[in-house]
Structures are given as structure tokens and as C-alpha cells.
């Protein structure tokens, strides 16, 4: 008797996960809608390396950011790959692009505008939710030789 399970993603699951990522992007300025897409235990590591643990803490961090000039910083996400780790856990590899529309900010001294974003999503009774989002900056080589 085999105890292994298939980790081949179905078209329906992949579409649901892609929809989740798209909805997260669309909801980035709506804290309530964004939080509904995350598990209660979610962990977030942003482009700057700030770690936020738990949906309540994440909601406060997002509300604070949206009440500041950071509300003029939006991101877009392009999915590179979706794969199952287990039947109910998927790893989503993305490229995140930051669009900083704040005035008076010297973007040359800011963080890179592109990052490698990895989501870990989990399936629950309510569908797929984000359990972890981690973004690693993608550094652009400089010509300072």
C-alpha cells in the first residue's frame, strides 16, 4: 500500500491560487479585503526585510502604511511558477515590481524596485489563503568600475 500522495496541481487549484495572488494585488490599498486573503498566522517579510507576524499585526502595519506617504507606493506581481508542496500547500514564485509615486523621494537611494516574491498558500475550508509572503530584493548591477 502506497502512502504517497500526488502533488500535481490541478487546473482548478492553479486558477484559484492565481486568482488569490491577483486579488491580493488589487486589494493592496484595502486593508480589510487584503486581510481576508491571509491566514490568521500569516507571516510577511517585505522588500526592506521587515517581518510582520500574524494577521492582526499585519493589518495594523498596513493601516499605518496607508495613512502615510507609503500609500503612494504600489506594487505589481507577475507569477513565475505555481507548484504544490503538499495537497493543501502551494508555493508561488513571483516577480514583484514597486511603483513609488511619492513626490520628493530620491528613488536612487531607495530599495531596489524589483523583488523575488514567494508566497506559501494553504487550502482551508474557505479556499486558498496566503500563509507567508517573503520578498527578496533583486539588485541591479551598477557600473561603478
Model regions and ranges:
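Short, low-complexity N-terminal intrinsically disordered segments enriched in polar/charged residues
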Residues: 1-40, 142-145
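A solvent-exposed, acidic/Ser-Thr-rich amphipathic alpha-helical stretch
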Residues: 14, 31-88, 111
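Terminus-proximal functional modules
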Residues: 15-16, 20, 88-90, 95
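Generic short beta-strand segments
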Residues: 43, 93-101, 136
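Hydrophobic/aromatic beta-strand elements that line small-molecule binding cavities or substrate pockets
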Residues: 58, 62, 77-83, 96-98, ...
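A short, structured loop/turn motif at beta-sheet edges
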Residues: 82-91, 121-129
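Short, cysteine-centered beta-strand-loop-beta hairpins and adjacent loop/turn segments enriched
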Residues: 98-110, 139
